[in-house]
């Protein structure tokens, strides 16, 4: 009889645990720049798109942890202690991490800020006006994006690369990708160094293009 109770008890615990697992809220961490960040609704009409994201979900099912930072580049968000380190520390297995950078990586004409600073110092030149946030589109930008991907996966998280918010550079009826770091629909080139494919999205380009066509 005791064995029957034990079997029944274990079965009940398993059932309860499965119910908790089924109803646990999905957590989505979002990292990026000003187009994603939170803003004070009492002082400005500016809004980051991830600031508005929670309203599309039941908070019991999906929780948005928006960590977008105005002025952040892929490099500065990774290196400055208040940002990526505090995000990745709270990423758990099954969490999603939305990654969106590019606009602030285009400093110094597409040159890496640290390289430009080092070159200036070597030649006795002023470093005033050189922005360390800058990355090279084919080098350090990809390096930091890959770091976000690989560190997220190492924690059991699911990285999602989001292309930067589309800028209104129209040439006739077509939007030109002026941004040097705007990889468009080609983020798959990161795959070879990212241990598998990573989902990508370019909906803001498609949306803006559709409005222009109207």
Model regions and ranges:
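Alpha-helical cap/lid subdomain in secreted, periplasmic
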Residues: 6, 85-214
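Active-site neighborhood of divalent metal-dependent phosphoester/pyrophosphate hydrolases
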Residues: 33, 69-74, 104-105
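Charged, often glycine-rich, active-site loop that binds/positions anionic groups
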Residues: 73-87
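Serine-esterase "nucleophile elbow" of acetyl-processing enzymes
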Residues: 23-69, 84-97, 115-121
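Short, solvent-exposed loop/turn segments at secondary-structure boundaries
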Residues: 40-44, 76-79, 173-174, 199
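Bacterial N-terminal signal peptides
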Residues: 11-19
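Bacterial N-terminal signal peptides that target proteins for export
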Residues: 1-12
């Amino acid at each position: 009889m005791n064995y029957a109770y034990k079997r029944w008890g274990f079965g009940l615990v398993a059932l309860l645990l499965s119910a908790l697992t089924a109803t646990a809220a999905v957590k989505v961490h979002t990292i990026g720049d000003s187009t994603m960040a939170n803003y004070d609704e009492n002082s400005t009409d500016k809004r980051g798109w991830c600031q508005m994201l929670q309203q599309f979900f039941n908070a019991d099912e999906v929780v948005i942890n928006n960590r977008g930072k105005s002025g952040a580049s892929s490099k500065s968000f990774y290196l400055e202690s208040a940002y990526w380190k505090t995000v990745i520390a709270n990423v758990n297995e099954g969490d999603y991490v939305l990654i969106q950078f590019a606009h602030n990586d285009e400093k110094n004409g597409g040159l890496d800020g640290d390289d430009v600073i080092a070159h200036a110092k070597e030649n006795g030149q002023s470093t005033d006006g050189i922005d360390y946030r800058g990355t090279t589109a084919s080098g350090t930008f990809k390096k930091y994006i890959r770091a976000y991907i690989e560190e997220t996966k190492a924690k059991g998280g699911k990285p999602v690369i989001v292309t930067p918010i589309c800028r209104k550079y129209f040439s006739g009826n077509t939007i030109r990708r002026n941004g040097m770091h705007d990889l468009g629909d080609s983020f798959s080139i990161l795959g070879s160094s990212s241990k598998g494919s990573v989902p990508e999205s370019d909906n803001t380009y498609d949306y803006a293009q559709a409005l222009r066509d109207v």
